[in-house]
Amino acid sequence: MKNQNTRVEEGIRMELNIDRIRIFEGDIVKMRVDAIVNAANNTLLGGGGVDGAIHRAAGPALLEECKTLNGCPTGEAKITSGYLLPAKYIIHTVGPVWQGGEKGEDELLASCYRKSLELARDYKIKTIAFPAISTGAYGFPSERAAGIAVSQVKEFLQKNEIPETVYLVCYNKDSCKSIKKALSKIL
C-alpha cells in the first residue's frame, strides 16, 4: 500500500485505515472518488456548509438536475452526476436537525448512511466519501453522529462487496477524534 492517499486528493493526510473504512481530514469536494455524499437540505437546491461548497464546485448544471428531483425527505438519498467535481456522482442525503435526541434523530441519521450506501451499491460505486452528516448547522452531537456513521458503514460493508472503500471525511481535528473513537469501539 504505497501512499494511497495521493490518489484520493493531493494534500489530504490519511488518518486511519481499518479494512475498507478510511478516515481523512480535508476537503470532500476535491476528493477523487467515485462518489461524494452531500449533506443536503430537503430542497436539494444548495445551501451552506458542505452543500453550498459542492454546488459551487460542481457548477450550475448540478442545480438544474437537482430541480428535477423534487427535493428529498429527511433520512433518504438521491443521486446525481458529479458534473465539474472529480467525483463521477454526488449522493445527496438529508440529515436530521438535532432536537435533543427524542425525535428519532438517531434513526434518521442512520438511514442517511444506509440509503447512501444502497445507492452506491446499486450504481456499482467502488469508492465513496461521506462528510459528517448533520454535525454542522443541524447541530447533531459529533461523537454521537460518528458512532452512528461508523456502525452503519461497518454493518453495510459486512454484508456487501460494493462499495469497496468508504472514506469518512473530517473537517477538523475534533471531527477526526470523534470518528477514531467510534472506530476504536467496534474493533
UniProtKB/Swiss-Prot annotation:
SMART domains registered for this protein in UniProt: A1pp
Pfam families: Macro
Single annotated GO MF: deacetylase activity
PROSITE patterns the UniProt entry points to: MACRO
Residues of the Macro domain: 8-187
Family, similarity comment: Belongs to the MacroD-type family.
Matches recorded under PANTHER family: GANGLIOSIDE INDUCED DIFFERENTIATION ASSOCIATED PROTEIN 2-RELATED, MACRO DOMAIN-CONTAINING PROTEIN
Stated name of the protein: Macro domain-containing protein MM_0177
